[in-house]
Amino acid sequence: MADSPVRPSMSHSYHCRIYVTLRPSVLDPAGTAVQSGLQQLGYDGVSQVRIGKYIELTLEAPDEATASQQLDTMCDQLLANTVIENYCFEITALEGAVTP
């Protein structure tokens, strides 16, 4: 079993937004159903609807590079099924959020 990440002695807080979507080659029945429903409501210009997941979390790390590496690992291990899903994320440092 892999070691748990060690909490750094001095860390910064980061607000993280993770977007998980099905790979383009994977059928999206939920997206198809939403697209059909919108078109039935008269929104004929709607096409290529894809349904995904949006995740927000706060992460403490010594620096943004470490936060990015940890977030990438979290996505690979749990937050996304990388066989059928792609993911991307945004990291924003929280102002003045340094913890001892």
Curated annotation (Swiss-Prot):
Annotated EC: 6.3.5.3
GO MF: ATP binding; phosphoribosylformylglycinamidine synthase activity
PANTHER family: PHOSPHORIBOSYLFORMYLGLYCINAMIDINE SYNTHASE SUBUNIT PURS
Functional description taken from the UniProt entry: Part of the phosphoribosylformylglycinamidine synthase complex involved in the purines biosynthetic pathway. Catalyzes the ATP-dependent conversion of formylglycinamide ribonucleotide (FGAR) and glutamine to yield formylglycinamidine ribonucleotide (FGAM) and glutamate. The FGAM synthase complex is composed of three subunits. PurQ produces an ammonia molecule by converting glutamine to glutamate. PurL transfers the ammonia molecule to FGAR to form FGAM in an ATP-dependent manner.
Protein's recorded name: Phosphoribosylformylglycinamidine synthase subunit PurS
Disulphide-bridged cysteine pairs: none
A GO CC term attached to the entry: cytoplasm
Top-rank lineage group of the source organism: Bacteria
Record carries keyword Plastid: no
Quaternary assembly: Homodimer. Part of the FGAM synthase complex composed of 1 PurL, 1 PurQ and 2 PurS subunits.
Pathway annotation from the record: Purine metabolism; IMP biosynthesis via de novo pathway; 5-amino-1-(5-phospho-D-ribosyl)imidazole from N(2)-formyl-N(1)-(5-phospho-D-ribosyl)glycinamide: step 1/2
Reactions the enzyme catalyzes: N(2)-formyl-N(1)-(5-phospho-beta-D-ribosyl)glycinamide + L-glutamine + ATP + H2O = 2-formamido-N(1)-(5-O-phospho-beta-D-ribosyl)acetamidine + L-glutamate + ADP + phosphate + H(+)
Record organism: Synechocystis sp. (strain ATCC 27184 / PCC 6803 / Kazusa)
Subcellular location: Cytoplasm
Keywords on record: ATP-binding, Cytoplasm, Ligase, Nucleotide-binding, Purine biosynthesis
GO biological process: 'de novo' IMP biosynthetic process
Keyword ATP-binding among UniProt keywords: yes
Protein encoded by which gene: purS
InterPro entries for the chain: PurS, PurS-like_sf
Main subcellular localisation: cytoplasm
Family: Belongs to the PurS family.
